[in-house]
Amino acid sequence: MKRLLIIGLLTLSLYSFVPVTICGINTNDTRMMSQPAISAGHIAFIYAEDLWTADLDGSNPKRLTVDEGIESNPCFSHDGRLIAFSAQYDGNTDVYIIPVEGGVPVRLTWHPNSDLVRGFTPDGKSVLFASQRSSFTNRYLQLFTVGIGGGF
């Protein structure tokens, strides 16, 4: 009987090292979530190099991009209807926007230097991004804007 009790306790102690699943979500998987952006009704974040949104309480996660490229730097417009983000689809990082409900991303910049989203202008008509496109030494980022209707 004593031997059976010891084996049972050892078995239970081994299970204490197994990752716990809470509400169907493996808590270890959340380590891949990064770069959160918050609006009045949603959270946008990068998970496994794709852009996702969820409700403020974390429910209803929705994958917005499924491209082979790498998305980064999500940012909500002031009215919460658009998400601007940087993406590397053609070997270069450019600025894109997408409706918060999802859809096809719209490319706003076409430049050989990386364009990294930093936010929206106060009027919401342009996206603010950082780039080395005008820098002689490629050591310093400068800020630029591009209209949400497209640009350079």
Predicted segments, located by residue:
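Positively charged n-region of N-terminal signal peptides that target proteins for export
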Residues: 1-4
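Bacterial N-terminal signal peptides
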Residues: 7-19
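Sec/Tat signal peptide C-region and signal peptidase I cleavage site
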Residues: 21-23
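Beta-strand-rich domains and repeat architectures in extracellular enzymes and scaffolds
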Residues: 25-56, 73
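Short coil/turn segments that connect the beta-strands within blades of beta-propeller domains
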Residues: 40-41, 79-81, 123-125
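A flexible loop/linker signature enriched in serine peptidases of the S9 family
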Residues: 46-52, 65-71, 84-96, 104-116, ...
